[in-house]
């Protein structure tokens, strides 16, 4: 009963969080409707082969051949035996709430746990949770289907809570919280978000260090640091399978360093990603005002005509054009919405800079500034270049605008510290009232100025790209159209300026009423909570709203099979590939749903495959389209051996070509080399450049090009004859079986993508795989009849799983110790109480 009484308010807060989360998604959650997310819909084909194989065999394959000729599944909803336990524990943490509802719930709960670790009272912690959880970006990523990112962001605050507890001297609680939530965090599988939050932790640890130096408590600081490190290591160990294989995979992807030596390296980073690619989505410098004013740049990249209020100012003559023009006019190529942290929250943050004391304030300010500067990306390249070149791992991630998640954490936290300071020391509103006015002026004042004089501060309401596009219109339309467009967008901007202004005015009124003792602390907190919740709720409903939810059957219905799909699927060959020339080949996974595609979409495709796309596959696609069209689809009139040899070596058996009216037609490729073949010769080269260049200098059906480092595995082949045959007799995505007949032996090339971890056996005896033609597997066999098996069951999986289960044992032991210590402490407390 005492325990229940102690935590009753916390339990009530958790219930309120669950109610808020349910209400946001009403009536969709009551109707059983689900969110139709483009990113999730696009991933159907990506994981379809993996899912089918699991349904049929009960086994999880770590390889699929459905996209990009073949790639690991480590970053396709990764699942390991060790993480299944974590999945069940996280469901309990979510209170088994339904999808979408629990996303918001864990946002709220996570920040609440952290603020309680900072020793905030329940009501203040609840308010802080609301203003953090309802930051617009967190709802935008739900709408976009970036669910791993949602999970990662939700688990970070409670992980930081463990760090805070450790540095406050509560070592065991800090250790357990750090271990559990770092395990949750790593399991969420969004390394980019975790990496960004490490900057926050670094700044906070520095603040704790400064405090320890001032108090002469370095020993205590060292102990707390050790506790945090041990907790993190336990959390990491539970996810070692996922972490290790993600790291290993990363070395082979576009995020790993290329072996090619490029002539123009100025745009390259050490990670292998181009600077332009990394910074493509960079926040505009003046776009940073969205933190205070959500529609400072128009909001999301949706048709302007969808904004009914703004269209009241539209010239009827241009309504059709406004269907094509976006509401957003910022620097990014496009956006699903702005980063808005709350207008009154911004004012409290500024106030916190004035009245909060101690190193933690400076740590949060430094992290905020860093986040904003890095979010500018290509708009502030000297600073960005420094991080790309010298800060470990920073160049591994693109979409630099998303680093604003740091500011979305630090701004609400310092804002809540300011409010806590006011409640703990009410006299501060009297003694430092000028600082309140200054904070009001620096936020509401700017909103007012922008609303009254938008063109003075923001002269550009039309992007450079839009200006160029509009110049294609007749000259007599350009002036009136651009003038009307500016007027519409000004109205969007000024409307939100006034909105933020009044939110800050109302919030400031709560502070003044508290100063005048017309409101108690709890009533002030409740009023601010309602104000901020309504403010941010309304903004979020612009980007995640009920009409986006559809009947569950829409998502679960299998992808519709086209006539082209049906024709190709009549081919009962075990394994062949399809090239869809009627789609955006390397930006879609629909083809992969029913076929093994040459194309696909994945943000981390294998680097060598991408390099082959750039050097050979993309040029061959253009030549193929032209040649097949000129031949009227008659492949006997197409010189396939010379026009598309790389596609042939990838066993591209079918091309899908576009027809008028959106229809498609399949064309069979008679030149495809098949699943495997003997070559007459292996031509060895000295480096990756010579290897990729050599591919189009030989007849790939008879000659293989290999890096000299594979000479020991492959040796040399011999001239073949018609009796040399390689036939696939069994296909599984992670296990391929071939029947080989050859009187001469030699090197067999497989039309399968080379990747570390694949093993080969000949008649049950292991042989070493080599890599040829830049991306394919090969082995050398002796004369005779053989059974060759290629298998992908990496030994590293067993090793990392063993470590993970040891980690579970350590964590369970710590939990038992923690419970024992708590029971002992309570007994001691009760004994003292009874004596008194």
What would you call each of these model-derived segments?
Residues 10-46, 231-245, 370-374, 446-452, ...:
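Transmembrane signal-anchor helices characteristic of membrane glycosylation enzymes that use polyprenol
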Residues 18-114, 130-153, 267-341, 374-384, ...:
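Membrane-interface coil-to-helix junctions
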Residues 54, 59, 65-72, 79, ...:
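Extracytoplasmic/lumenal acceptor-recognition loop(s) of multi-pass membrane glycoenzymes
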Residues 97-111, 337-352, 407-416, 499-507:
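Hydrophobic alpha-helical transmembrane segments
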Residues 115-134, 172-175:
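Transmembrane-helix signature of polytopic, membrane-embedded enzymes
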Residues 129, 145-154, 166-183, 191-193, ...:
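Contiguous transmembrane helix-bundle modules in multi-pass membrane proteins
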Residues 223-283:
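Polar, glycine-rich mid-to-C-terminal structural blocks
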Residues 347, 653, 662, 702-836:
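Active-site-proximal, structured, solvent-exposed surfaces of multi-pass membrane proteins
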């Amino acid at each position: 009963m005492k325990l229940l009484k102690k935590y009753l308010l916390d339990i009530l807060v958790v219930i309120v969080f669950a109610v808020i989360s349910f209400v946001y998604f009403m009536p969709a959650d009551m109707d059983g409707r689900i969110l139709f997310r483009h990113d999730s819909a696009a991933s159907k084909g990506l994981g379809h082969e993996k899912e089918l194989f699991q349904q049929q065999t009960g086994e999880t394959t770590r390889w699929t051949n459905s996209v990009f000729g073949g790639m690991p599944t480590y970053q396709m909803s990764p699942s390991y035996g060790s993480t299944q336990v974590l999945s069940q524990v996280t469901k309990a943490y979510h209170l088994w709430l339904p999808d979408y509802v629990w996303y918001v719930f864990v946002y709220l709960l996570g920040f609440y746990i952290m603020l309680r670790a900072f020793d905030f009272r329940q009501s203040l912690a609840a308010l802080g949770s609301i203003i953090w959880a309802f930051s617009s970006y967190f709802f935008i990523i739900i709408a976009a289907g970036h669910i791993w990112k949602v999970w990662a962001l939700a688990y970070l605050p409670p992980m930081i809570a463990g760090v805070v507890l450790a540095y406050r001297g509560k070592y065991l609680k800090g250790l357990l919280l750090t271990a559990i939530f770092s395990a949750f965090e790593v399991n969420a599988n969004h390394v980019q978000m975790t990496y960004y939050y490490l900057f926050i932790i670094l700044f906070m640890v520095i603040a704790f260090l400064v405090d320890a130096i001032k108090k002469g408590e370095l020993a205590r600081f060292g102990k707390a640091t050790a506790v945090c490190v041990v907790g993190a290591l336990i959390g990491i160990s539970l996810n070692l399978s996922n972490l290790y294989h993600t790291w290993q995979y990363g070395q082979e992807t576009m995020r790993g360093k290329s072996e090619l030596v490029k002539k123009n390296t100025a745009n390259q980073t050490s990670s292998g990603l181009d600077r332009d690619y990394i910074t493509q989505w960079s926040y505009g410098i003046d776009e940073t005002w969205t933190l205070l004013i959500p529609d400072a740049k128009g909001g999301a990249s949706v048709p302007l005509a969808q904004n009914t209020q703004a269209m009241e100012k539209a010239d009827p003559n241009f309504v059709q054009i406004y269907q094509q023009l976006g509401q957003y006019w910022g620097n990014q190529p496009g956006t699903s919405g702005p980063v808005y942290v709350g207008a009154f929250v911004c004012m409290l943050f500024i106030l916190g800079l004035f009245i909060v004391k101690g190193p933690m304030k400076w740590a949060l300010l430094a992290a905020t500034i860093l986040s904003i500067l890095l979010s500018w990306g290509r708009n502030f390249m000297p600073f960005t270049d420094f991080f790309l070149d010298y800060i470990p791992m920073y160049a591994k991630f693109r979409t630099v605008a998303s680093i604003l998640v740091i500011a979305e954490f630090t701004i609400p936290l310092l804002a809540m510290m300011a409010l806590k300071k006011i409640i703990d020391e009410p006299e501060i509103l009297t003694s430092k009232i000028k600082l309140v006015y200054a904070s009001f002026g620096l936020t509401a004042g700017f909103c007012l100025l922008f609303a009254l004089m938008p063109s003075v501060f923001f002269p550009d309401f039309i992007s450079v790209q839009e200006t160029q596009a509009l110049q294609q219109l007749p000259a007599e339309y350009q002036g009136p159209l651009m003038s009307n467009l500016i007027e519409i967008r000004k109205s969007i901007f000024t409307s939100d300026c006034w909105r933020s202004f009044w939110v800050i005015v109302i919030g400031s009124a709560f502070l003044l009423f508290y100063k005048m003792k017309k409101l108690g602390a709890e009533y002030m907190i409740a009023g601010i909570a309602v104000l901020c919740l309504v403010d941010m709720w309304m903004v979020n409903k612009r980007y995640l709203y009920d009409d986006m939810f559809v009947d569950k059957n829409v998502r679960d219905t299998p992808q519709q099979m086209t006539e082209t799909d049906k024709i190709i699927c009549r081919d009962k060959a075990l394994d062949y590939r399809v090239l869809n020339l009627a789609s955006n080949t390397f930006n879609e996974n629909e083809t992969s749903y029913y076929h093994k595609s040459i194309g696909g979409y994945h943000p981390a495709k294998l680097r060598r495959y991408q390099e082959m796309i750039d050097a050979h596959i993309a040029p061959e696609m253009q030549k193929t389209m032209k040649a097949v069209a000129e031949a009227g689809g008659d492949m006997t009139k197409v010189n396939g051996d010379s026009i598309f040899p790389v596609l042939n070596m990838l066993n591209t058996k079918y091309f899908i070509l576009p027809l008028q009216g959106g229809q498609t037609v399949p064309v069979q490729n008679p030149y495809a080399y098949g699943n495997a073949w003997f070559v007459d010769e292996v031509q060895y080269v000295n480096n990756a450049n010579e290897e990729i260049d050599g591919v189009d200098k030989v007849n790939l059906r008879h000659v293989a090009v290999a890096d000299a480092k594979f000479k020991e595995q492959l040796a040399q082949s011999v001239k073949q004859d018609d009796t040399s045959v390689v036939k696939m007799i069994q296909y599984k995505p992670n296990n391929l079986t071939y029947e080989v007949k050859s009187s001469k032996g030699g090197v067999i090339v497989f039309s399968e993508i080379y990747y570390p971890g694949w093993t080969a056996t000949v008649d049950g005896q292991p042989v070493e795989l080599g890599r040829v033609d830049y991306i394919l597997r090969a082995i050398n066999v002796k004369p005779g009849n053989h059974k060759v098996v290629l298998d992908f069951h990496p030994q590293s999986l067993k090793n990392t799983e063993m470590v993970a289960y040891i980690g579970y044992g350590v964590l369970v032991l710590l939990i038992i110790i923690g419970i024992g210590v708590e029971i002992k402490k309570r007994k001691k407390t009760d004994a003292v109480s009874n004596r008194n």
